[in-house]
UniProtKB/Swiss-Prot annotation:
Subunit structure: Forms oligomers.
Assigned protein family: Belongs to the MraZ family.
Name of the protein in its database record: Transcriptional regulator MraZ
GO cellular component, one term: cytoplasm
Disulfide bonds: none
Gene field: mraZ
Gene3D superfamilies the record matches: Transcriptional regulator MraZ domain
Length: 151
């Protein structure tokens, strides 16, 4: 399980180092193999261990292909998916096209989302986090099923 928001840096080649606290789990689950694709809702990237991505692919394959919405989602997620592998230093290269989509430059945030990570431009992450916090604090903004989760 991946938790927490981690400030990271991309080097001039577009490589970033996976925080060391996640490396052992990624190595044991998927031998350091990752899939990176766009997030279809937010302006960020999704980084999946290979075993989690295979579950997503199975679900996408099961969608009826005659529905345009399904084909659209498949095109976006699968068409932008890139196979990557952590190198000996725990780094991986984010391809230029995906860096451009998420507007990644030097400073980024790698955010654990339990089964995957989101990779954000740091400024975009800070803005979205502030907006999310403000929105959820509005009276009546939280659905009943979420209120039961709050400790």
């Amino acid at each position: 399980m991946f938790r927490g928001a981690n400030a990271i840096s991309l080097d001039a080649k577009g490589r970033l180092a996976m925080p060391s606290r996640y490396r052992d789990e990624l190595d044991s689950r998927s031998s350091g193999q990752l899939i990176v694709t766009i997030d279809a809702v937010d302006p960020c990237l999704c980084v999946y261990p290979l075993d989690e991505w295979e579950i997503i692919e199975t679900k996408l394959r099961a969608l009826p292909s005659l529905r345009e919405e399904n084909r659209r989602l498949q095109r976006l997620l699968i068409g932008n998916a890139v196979d990557l592998e952590l190198d000996g230093s725990g780094r991986f290269l984010v391809p230029p096209r995906l860096r451009e989509y998420a507007k990644l430059d030097k400073r980024a945030m790698l955010v654990g989302q339990l089964n995957k990570f989101q990779l954000w431009d740091e400024d975009a992450w800070n803005a979205v986090s502030a907006a999310d916090l403000a929105a959820i604090q509005q009276p009546g903004a939280m659905p009943d099923e979420l209120r039961d989760l709050i400790l």
